Swiss-Prot record:
Complex and partners: F-type ATPases have 2 components, F(1) - the catalytic core - and F(0) - the membrane proton channel. F(1) has five subunits: alpha(3), beta(3), gamma(1), delta(1), epsilon(1). F(0) has four main subunits: a(1), b(1), b'(1) and c(10-14). The alpha and beta chains form an alternating ring which encloses part of the gamma chain. F(1) is attached to F(0) by a central stalk formed by the gamma and epsilon chains, while a peripheral stalk is formed by the delta, b and b' chains.
Gene for this chain: atpF1
Transmembrane segments: 28-48
Family listed: Belongs to the ATPase B chain family.
Organism: Acaryochloris marina (strain MBIC 11017)
InterPro entries in alphabetical order: ATP_synth_b/b'su_bac/chlpt (IPR002146)
Protein name, per record: ATP synthase subunit b 1
Keyword Transmembrane carried by entry: yes
Topology term for the membrane: Single-pass membrane protein
GO molecular function: proton-transporting ATP synthase activity, rotational mechanism
């Protein structure tokens, strides 16, 4: 209330004719009137807006803190999931290497076995064919070679199908590795 009285008395001293008349009138000095209005508006904003603004800031701060904590939790969860998936990938790659090594070992054993059987078969045919002419011997040897090759391929294919038949991912990895060994892109 003291501020109002001060402003009123200051206004009266600026206009002595109004003070003598004993009343108030409009103040036409724009700068002086704006200053008074600004002081009143700022005072009202501070008085009434303090609670609203403080409450808004508290709510906003809580929302930001919640968002940050959720983001941190999501980041930790994602890091844990990534570690698990990398571990699973490493295990799958190790298993694929084992399967490939076993397949190669079995294929080489099958090849050696087929070659040994072919040698004994060739020897048997040579012994039996010594009575035939040399032309019939050559035909028989060529035929045996063809059969042995066909048998070897069938045996290797059967062994690979037995080992890799139910494991599509191992088949896919074996094919990709074979293509890579040949210089292709998978």
């Amino acid at each position: 209330m003291g501020m109002f009285n001060w402003l009123a008395s200051a206004g009266m001293t600026g206009f002595p004719q109004l003070a003598e008349a004993g009343g108030y009138s409009l103040n036409f000095d724009i700068l002086e009137a704006n200053l008074v209005n600004l002081v009143i508006v700022i005072g009202l904003l501070i008085y009434f807006g303090r609670g609203f603004l403080g409450e808004s800031l508290v709510k906003r701060r809580e929302a930001i803190e919640t968002a940050i904590s959720e983001a941190e939790a999501n980041q930790e969860k994602a890091a844990a999931t990534l570690a698990e998936e990398q571990e699973k990938l490493a295990q799958a790659q190790a298993e694929a290497k084992k399967i490939l090594a076993n397949a190669q070992t079995n294929a080489s054993k099958a090849k050696e076995q087929i070659l040994a059987e072919a040698k004994t078969e060739i020897q048997r045919i040579k012994d039996a064919g010594s009575q035939d002419t040399s032309a019939s011997q050559e035909r028989a040897i060529a035929e045996i070679r063809q059969r042995v090759t066909a048998m070897a391929l069938e045996k290797v294919e059967a062994d690979l199908k037995n080992q890799l038949g139910n494991n599509e991912s191992a088949q896919r990895k074996l094919v990709d590795q074979s293509i890579a060994l040949l210089g292709g892109n998978s």
